[in-house]
């Protein structure tokens, strides 16, 4: 009989009670066996379960285990009674064995947690080990990074010491003009190799003392660089040299590279019909990606991409905007027209600038929109009507006939003179090869005549005006500073004033062997590689009198004081201003002879 049965008295339990007790013991034994055989997934999971059982359910589990132990003993007693009364079946033997096994397990499972397992603190030893491991890894990584930084610094220092006397790159052809197999001139032109050679030559010229090849001079490198520029970008040697002289070596290459890329597409809001915010919203709704052109303009928008033709939208046809280069805003902004003024635009086609002037005047005053090319006046008239300009008169005269044969007395005159187009080469690639020295001389002469006519057409006594703005889309000195210098000599009754433009480089006051008036620093130059707009030149002059002083202009220019000259009493009115045709013919003849000599023709000596 069982241990408890020996100490008890009374009627033994019924068969049903014995069966229920045995069934409970069997289920408990199976649960314990299943929990014992269940594999542990990981150490972390085991630790978590132990913590949970320790801190949350330790008391309840101990009580449960004790209750199960009592039940097991009671079941064992019943089993002993059954053994005395009737023989055991196979199932009973199995239950008995299971109960005995569970009894041993039960005795082991009831333990004092203080004896066999120490209560772990909130941060256990294992988590501390993990933290120590993480700290060790962080320290190792930090040491590794420090070592790498130290190594990089050491390599940089070694490279710096090496670059003090770097090896000179071989970019020039041999002195004898031959390679190992064939002459340089017969070698195929690989554009990628030419580009690399351009970069190497620029690097050498920027540090010529340390990188030049022995026995080579700077002119050889410059000559090779110009040859490569002509081959790579497609310029004539004459134009490449003319543009190369304007910049440093590095900047010159940047300029040539910028001429291969188009400028951003820009539009100007017509404030006579709409506002920029409203126009931008309307175009965005049509799938146009745009943004304001910059803080310097209140009407310009730059278009990045468009799902519709930007020159055929309903807004365009309604005259809410006009496609206009950002550089064309600048002369009008410098002119700063005021309402109710009489203004002359001497070369106004296709109408971007004249319509901007009308918008600033709010359709007040009067504008003479002149252009010497009759065919271009058609586009001019079309834009004037489309944009709703009502204060403009379109005329077709040679600008040199103002004011004597046409009309004068304007408050302001805008002269966007015809030019070589060296600032907009990306628009017309033919400029690279079809411009000669004779073309520049002819254009420069025409520009000087037009500027003198513009000065003479302005009323110096205007209460609000008396200004002339001269601009070109060229960056050559012959068409820009040289023309202004000529006008200052011929018309001492004008002076240069600030353009009022917020950005742009100052004009040249000296260029190579040429020296210009100090006030030319008030002019502004714009370059595609610097400002991301067309190459442009803008100058603003103020007419201080309608009379031309009879002073020695040549001596006055040496002193640099012709702009502030006092108008003397013995002045002549400009009622019948005429050009010196003899002097013009002489200049033209000199240019013709010079051009013939450059082509290799023998020119007879000039007769006295």
From Swiss-Prot:
Where in or outside the cell it occurs: the entry states:
Nucleus; Nucleus, Nucleolus
Alphabetical keyword list: Methyltransferase, Nucleus, Phosphoprotein, Ribosome biogenesis, RNA-binding, S-adenosyl-L-methionine, Transferase
Biological process per Gene Ontology, one example term: rRNA base methylation
Q: What is its EC number?
A: 2.1.1.-
Cited PROSITE patterns:
NOL1_NOP2_SUN, SAM_MT_RSMB_NOP
Keyword Methyltransferase appears in the UniProt entry: yes
Q: Which reaction does it catalyse?
A: a cytidine in 25S rRNA + S-adenosyl-L-methionine = a 5-methylcytidine in 25S rRNA + S-adenosyl-L-homocysteine + H(+)
Family affiliation: Belongs to the class I-like SAM-binding methyltransferase superfamily. RsmB/NOP family.
Q: What does this protein do?
A: S-adenosyl-L-methionine-dependent methyltransferase that specifically methylates the C(5) position of a cytosine in 25S rRNA. Required for 60S ribosomal subunit synthesis and processing.
Designated name of the protein: 25S rRNA (cytosine-C(5))-methyltransferase nop2
What taxonomic lineage is listed for the species of origin? Eukaryota, Fungi, Dikarya, Ascomycota, Taphrinomycotina
Query: What gene, per UniProt, encodes this protein?
Result: nop2
